[in-house]
């Protein structure tokens, strides 16, 4: 019974962790839109805008990657099962 409860809670936790991937997707879309708008207003600053936008996208994506790692650990290398 305890093993089934831990596996169910791990699956729910993995699902909640993957919901965290929604935020970076929305943020990156918003940043890309604003970056395109900025390049449209100042085409001569395209290099600086692109560099800043890519750095921001990388930082935002790290949250989604961390959530994916947590979900994979909970599903495939569950450390809680060793406590039983």
Curated annotation (Swiss-Prot):
InterPro entries reported for this sequence: ATP_synth_csu_bac/chlpt (IPR005953), ATP_synth_F0_csu (IPR000454), ATPase_proteolipid_c-like_dom (IPR002379), F/V-ATP_Csub_sf (IPR035921)
UniProt note on regulation of activity: Inhibited by dicyclohexylcarbodiimide; the enzyme is protected from inhibition by Na(+) in a pH-dependent manner.
Give the site residues for Reversibly binds sodium during transport: 65
Localization per Swiss-Prot or TrEMBL: Cell membrane
* Keywords for this protein: ATP synthesis, Cell membrane, CF(0), Hydrogen ion transport, Ion transport, Lipid-binding, Membrane, Sodium, Sodium transport, Transmembrane, Transmembrane helix, Transport
How does the annotation summarize its subunit structure? F-type ATPases have 2 components, F(1) - the catalytic core - and F(0) - the membrane sodium channel. F(1) has five subunits: alpha(3), beta(3), gamma(1), delta(1), epsilon(1). F(0) has three main subunits: a(1), b(2) and c(11). The alpha and beta chains form an alternating ring which encloses part of the gamma chain. F(1) is attached to F(0) by a central stalk formed by the gamma and epsilon chains, while a peripheral stalk is formed by the delta and b chains.
Role: F(1)F(0) ATP synthase produces ATP from ADP in the presence of a sodium gradient. F-type ATPases consist of two structural domains, F(1) containing the extramembraneous catalytic core and F(0) containing the membrane proton channel, linked together by a central stalk and a peripheral stalk. During catalysis, ATP synthesis in the catalytic domain of F(1) is coupled via a rotary mechanism of the central stalk subunits to proton translocation.
The record's misc note reads: The ATPase of C.paradoxum is of special interest because it uses sodium ions instead of protons as the physiological coupling ion.
Protein name, per record:
ATP synthase subunit c, sodium ion specific
The lineage is: Bacteria, Bacillati, Bacillota, Clostridia, Peptostreptococcales
Its gene name is: atpE
